[in-house]
Amino acid sequence: MFSESNLFNNWNSNIKKYHEKQLEGLSIKSIETTKGIKLWSEFRPVDVVGLYVPGGTAPLFSSFLMQAIPAIIAGCKDIIVCTPPDKNGKIDPTILWVANLLNVKNIFKVGGSQAIFGMTYGTKSIPKCLKIFGPGNQYVTLAKMLVSNKVSIEMPAGPSEV
């Protein structure tokens, strides 16, 4: 029988293995194209990354894991999470449990396009993010497309995700 902790540890391990291997392939390689002229690729973590974690009727903690773990491995300094509250105004306990296990502290109780706009422009409480990740409904997708000239997004959701 699996406990929640065992399941989390298994998922965490699998996601980490994949992204750590991916990071190995991004080593800085330089070439000298002409005597004294060197070109190279350099990869740096995003300082402030925003993660949208859908909630409401079906909190997607798996999306949280698949977004947060790569951000942690990459070395992002600040991880901002926006997730909608349930009908009682509370964040789903599973989302909070995962956040605690991953040591993610900046969680905001806001969903939909409001969360995307908040992470894009910043608010009194939500820091402005440099890149935003995460799935969502058609409103979240449209909001991400609208702000894509202001902030980096991973990509709009496909038809199977909306």
Per-segment meaning from a language model:
Residues 1-47:
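N-terminal Rossmann-like NAD(P)+-binding subdomain of aldehyde/semialdehyde dehydrogenases
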Residues 1-15, 42, 64, 88, ...:
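Generic structural signal for well-ordered, non-membrane alpha-helical segments
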Residues 17-24, 51, 73, 104, ...:
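Alpha-helix capping at helix-to-loop junctions
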Residues 32-97:
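Conserved small-residue-rich beta-alpha loop and adjacent elements
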Residues 101-162:
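Conserved NAD(P)+-binding/catalytic subdomain of aldehyde/semialdehyde dehydrogenases
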